[in-house]
Design a protein with these regions (language model features):
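A short helix-loop-beta submotif of the ANL/AMP-binding
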Residues: 133-138
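Short beta->alpha connector loops at strand-helix junctions that form conserved
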Residues: 121, 140-145
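Short glycine-rich anion-binding loops that position phosphate/pyrophosphate groups of nucleotides
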Residues: 46, 103, 174-178
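N-terminal small-domain helix-loop-helix segment of the aminotransferase-like
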Residues: 10-101
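Short, Lys/Arg-enriched N-terminal segments with co-localized hydrophobic residues
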Residues: 1-6
Length: 192
């Protein structure tokens, strides 16, 4: 590997594989370039055109070249805090971080978190490699068809007892594809 000869790479990173979703997307583009008809069911990219009012707004702001605040646009954070306050959540703009996407925000969360991660399976393909990069210990929590791929209080208690008194972060991929869930189920788990 040319990178390994140019610089030393941390051992725990040497066996990381490329993102499977991006690898699949690259493979579909390769097949399409060779004339194959490909039906994409896995990549989370919308097949719908961008609404014209959004395109116009982006064009109006294309000349802005300043770095954004590290927590995101203040006006947007204030608007989100106001919206949450209307729903009885007590956050202000300083409690809110705007990011370029969920994957990046989940990565930052795992960098900051000092504890062990509970990862229900199946889950989004990026969370486990992110944990490896951040040297977080991961405990997989198997879900099953009978429970509609949802966490159950019994399984959560079992894995929590195994981890003990260490801090725990549960990365929940809900609403779960394809089965979905409802807020009441998540509230029940969070109260546990």
């Amino acid at each position: 590997n040319i990178i390994n000869t140019l610089m030393d790479i941390k051992n725990h990173l040497l066996n990381l594989q490329p993102s499977s979703t991006l690898a699949i997307n690259e493979k579909t583009k390769e097949l399409e370039s060779k004339g194959s008809k490909v039906y994409k069911f896995g990549f989370g990219q919308s097949p719908f055109p961008i609404p014209s009012d959004i395109v116009e707004e982006l064009a109006c702001n294309a000349s802005k070249k300043e770095y954004l605040p590290s927590k995101g646009l203040l006006e947007l954070r204030i608007a989100i805090a106001k919206n949450l306050k209307g729903k009885k959540y007590l956050f202000d703009q300083n409690d809110i971080i705007i990011g370029p996407g969920t994957k990046e925000l989940m990565f930052l969360l795992q960098i900051a978190f000092d504890g062990e991660i509970i990862l229900p399976i199946p889950s989004w393909v990026s969370y486990f490699p992110q944990a490896i990069i951040n040297r977080n210990k991961v405990h997989f929590l198997e879900t099953n068809f009978e429970d509609k791929w949802h966490l159950t209080e019994n399984k959560l208690k079992e894995i929590s007892d195994k981890i003990g008194n260490k801090k725990k972060l549960i990365i929940m991929n809900y609403p779960n594809n394809p089965s979905g869930t409802n807020p009441k189920k998540i509230e029940e788990l969070s109260s546990w």
